[in-house]
C-alpha cells in the first residue's frame, strides 16, 4: 500500500513541524548534491528555518562566488527589462541592499563556523572545505609568525653586536686613561723622591789651609793703613814701637 498524499498546509504542531523540517531539509540537500554530481550543474541552496537559522549547500567551494555570479546575472537582466530610469534606480538600490544584507549574514555565518559554532547544519563536504580553509589560514599564520620571529632575531643579533662593539671601545678608552694616569703618577712619585733626597755633606776644609785676608796693621802713633793688594798676606800682627826717651826710664835700643 503506497503512502498517502500529504496535504500542503502549515503544520500546527511545533514538534511535528520541526521534525518534518529536519527530514525535508536533509532530503533537499541530498537532492541538490545528487543533481550537481549527475548533471555537472552548479547548485546552491539557501534555507532559513522558522527561527531564522540558516542552512545552505553549494556545489562550489565558496558560496560568495555563487552569490556574486547570481547578482551580476540578475542585475544585467533587470537592466534590460527596466526602461524607466526612476524604476531602474530604485531597483538598483533594492538589489544593493539585498546584496549587502546577504553578504553580512554570510560573513556572520562563516565567522561562527570558523569559531566552531553552528556546525550541525553543515554537510561533510562543507566541513572538509572549512577544514581546508582553516589549514590554509594556519599555514599563512605560521609563515607570518616565523617571518616576524626571524626578523626579530636578526634585529636582536645586530643590537647585540653593536653593544659588544661599544663595550669594547669603552674598555679600550678606560685602559688608555688608566695607562695615562699611571704614567702621571710615576712621574709625580719620581719628582717627589728627587725633592726629598738628603743633601750630601760638604767636605770639611782645614782652617789652617784657608787663606785669610791680611788684617790691617796697626801703627801706634800713626794712621790706619789698608791692605796692599800687591803685598803678601801675613798672618801675624806687625807692631812697630818707636824708642821711648822719656820719663827718665833710660832708653831702649831698637
Curated annotation (Swiss-Prot):
InterPro entries: MADS-box/MEF2_TF (IPR050142), MEF2-like_N (IPR033896), TF_Kbox (IPR002487), TF_MADSbox (IPR002100), TF_MADSbox_sf (IPR036879). Residues 182-191 have a biased composition (Polar residues). This is Transcription factor CAULIFLOWER. Keywords: Activator, Coiled coil, Developmental protein, Differentiation, DNA-binding, Flowering, Nucleus, Transcription, Transcription regulation. Residues 1-61 form the MADS-box domain. The keyword DNA-binding applies. Homodimer capable of binding to CArG-box sequences.
Amino acid at each position: 500500500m503506497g503512502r498517502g498524499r500529504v496535504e500542503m498546509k502549515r503544520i500546527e504542531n511545533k514538534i511535528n513541524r520541526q521534525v518534518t523540517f529536519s527530514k525535508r531539509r536533509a532530503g533537499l540537500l541530498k537532492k541538490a548534491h545528487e543533481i550537481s554530481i549527475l548533471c555537472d550543474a552548479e547548485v546552491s541552496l539557501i534555507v532559513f528555518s522558522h527561527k531564522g537559522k540558516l542552512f545552505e549547500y553549494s556545489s562550489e567551494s565558496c558560496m560568495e562566488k555563487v552569490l556574486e555570479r547570481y547578482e551580476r546575472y540578475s542585475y544585467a537582466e533587470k537592466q534590460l527589462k527596466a526602461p524607466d530610469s526612476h524604476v531602474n534606480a530604485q531597483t538598483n538600490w533594492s538589489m544593493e541592499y539585498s546584496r549587502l544584507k546577504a553578504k553580512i549574514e554570510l560573513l556572520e555565518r562563516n565567522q561562527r563556523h570558523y569559531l566552531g559554532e553552528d556546525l550541525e547544519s553543515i554537510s561533510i563536504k562543507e566541513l572538509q572545505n572549512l577544514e581546508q580553509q582553516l589549514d590554509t589560514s594556519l599555514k599563512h599564520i605560521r609563515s607570518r609568525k616565523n617571518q616576524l620571529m626571524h626578523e626579530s632575531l636578526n634585529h636582536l643579533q645586530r643590537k647585540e653586536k653593536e653593544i659588544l662593539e661599544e663595550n669594547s671601545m669603552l674598555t679600550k678608552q678606560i685602559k688608555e686613561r688608566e695607562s695615562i694616569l699611571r704614567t702621571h703618577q710615576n712621574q709625580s712619585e719620581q719628582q717627589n723622591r728627587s725633592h726629598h733626597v738628603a743633601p750630601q755633606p760638604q767636605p770639611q776644609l782645614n782652617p789652617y789651609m784657608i787663606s785669610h785676608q791680611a788684617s790691617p796693621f796697626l801703627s801706634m802713633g800713626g794712621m790706619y793703613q789698608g791692605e796692599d793688594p800687591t803685598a803678601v798676606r801675613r798672618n801675624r800682627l806687625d807692631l812697630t814701637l818707636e824708642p821711648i826717651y822719656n820719663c827718665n826710664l833710660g832708653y831702649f835700643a831698637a
